[in-house]
Every structure is written in C-alpha cells, then in structure tokens.
C-alpha cells in the first residue's frame, strides 16, 4: 500500500489568485449573501452555458429535489428508480409522498419506461427519473406516459451537467430538472445545486420557496426554506465555469483509454458513447460478470483498494434495500431484477480531470491482470 492513492474523483478547483481577487470584491461590497451580484451573474452564465431558459441556484443538490416536489404540489405516489444516490428517494419521502420503485434498463442504468405504466395507480402524481452516470434516459417515452396519465416529471439530473441530445440540453425535458454542484461532480461550487424550469412564473415561485417564502420585504406567500447560495460560492462557480470544458475533455481522454484497454477483456462490460449525445464523462462504470471474468466485483474492488486505487460501487446497495424503504411492495428484488444484478456487478473506476497516463495504466493493470 506504499503507492500514492488514486481517488475515484478529484474536485475541479479555480485559480486561487483569481478567486482571491473575487473575494476582495465581496469583502469590499460587504454583500455576502441574499442574491448578490455574483449570484445573479452565475445564474445568467449557467443559463447560457447549459442552454436553459431559467435556473435557480441552491446550496446543495438535495434541496432542489425537495423544492421541485413542493413547487409542483406533488402528493401521493411518485414513480422512481432504486438505482441512484439516496437523495432521490429521500426527497420524495420528506415531502410525505410514497416512492414506487421501477426497474432499470441495462443499457443506461436509467428507469425502464416500458415498466412505468404497470406501476401507475390512482395515487400516482409524478415520475422522478435519474440520468444515471449522465446517460440520458428515454425522455420522449417517459413524457408520453406522463401526458397520457396527467403526471408531472421531475428529472434528477445531478450527473448530467452539460449533457445534450442532438444539441438540446436534457435539462429542458419534463417539468423541472435538478442539478448537483457537489465537489465530486464534473462542475462544482464546493457544495451547491440548481433547479431548471421553463417559465418566469415558476422561476419566481422557486425563488420564493428557497428564501423562506418571501415575495417582498414583508410578504410571505409560501412556507419556504432557506437554501440561498452565498457570494463566495457563486464567485467560485463563475471561475469554475471557465474551465469545465477542458476538464470534460480531459475526462473524455481517460474514458477512451479505459475503453481501448478493456474492450476485449472477458467478463467486463462498459458503456460506449450514445449516438447524438454530448457526454460529460462524469463516471466510468464497469460491470463484472464473475463467471467470465474469474472473480467477483467485490474481489476486484477490494484488490484495487489494497493497491490504493479507490473505485466506488455506485450504486450499491440499492435504495430499495435500506430500512426505510425495504418494506415497500415495489422494493422487492423480484420487482427489480436488473437493478439488483447491476448493483452487484458495478465498479466506478477513477474518473477525473487530473488523472495521468501513469495513473490510468496502473488502474488498468490491476483490472487486466
């Protein structure tokens, strides 16, 4: 274990001198929070970069999920995926709704739209799909189902910063989309997130809800929360936006090296780029068929850790196996065969903009040997 540690990710950091200059501006203005100039600039810059009409910044990636459900007044049951980070389902639970798990597709690890209709009941009010690993789900098919049954669609797009299909941002699908700007993501604001919406009226409502419900100095129009982004994180985000394209390009090169080396290794499967999709290379999951590969996922995972190579088993275990949710009828493994199998096969390899050729070679040697 003497070799230097290779982590699964590494945060994109702005130039420290440039950041210090922006901090001086904040100190001089004494406007630290409450939608200051850098907050406004970042919202505008993100709208332009992401090709979306309206965006509202949040202090993390979970609060946009909670707020979207509140803003759309979602009740009853929400159809979602068990193969995600727990915040997806927790946001449903915290809003007093019942999550209903639907199995996933093997080719994207996203919710399988062919299985959604069977999960709809008179209590269903919304669908919350996830663009897992930044791979777009079948949005048109999901929207057709939502339109047929009068359901809202909220996309958890935490992994999908900058992802486009045929030149159109995936964030424009559904009723709203949420983003995470956590330090582990392709683009980060230290901690942060955002909610994307389609019209000015909804933008105003979201901005009220994230500011205690205030619509003016003395008027409260809704029971809101406090999830405003401060000027320090907004400044940090503005600087990171200038370098995110280069970071994604670096990630793409790593993905290409992984694919070239692993393509013909028995028992290892991975995703190729999807036609017409602009990917962000946020993750590089591989799936281990133990019989063909000669060892289990966990054997490889712990062997890598012993050599200071820290992959992650995203997403194991399934959300549906946690104590809060395992009693739900939809949480049964028999209802989720694809998700259950993939959760036991997956390892996300190290993937970030700072990986060197030597790092990648070291990782690949551990897998190929």
What are these regions (language model features)?
Residues 84, 107-108, 134, 185, ...:
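Glycine-/small-residue-rich active-site loops that bind phosphorylated ligands and cofactors
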Residues 1-32, 350:
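N-terminal "arm"/small-domain region of PLP-dependent enzymes with the aminotransferase-like
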Residues 179-180, 193-199, 238:
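Short beta-strand-to-turn element immediately C-terminal to the catalytic PLP-Schiff-base lysine
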Residues 70-148, 152-157, 164:
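PLP-dependent aminotransferase-like
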Residues 56, 79, 100, 153-154, ...:
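Structural detector of well-ordered beta-strand residues that form the stable sheet scaffold
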Residues 31, 35-77, 83, 91-94, ...:
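Phosphate-binding glycine-rich loop
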Residues 155-189, 204, 216-221:
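Conserved active-site segment immediately N-terminal to the catalytic lysine
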Residues 37-45, 49-53, 114, 118, ...:
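PLP-dependent aminotransferase class I/II
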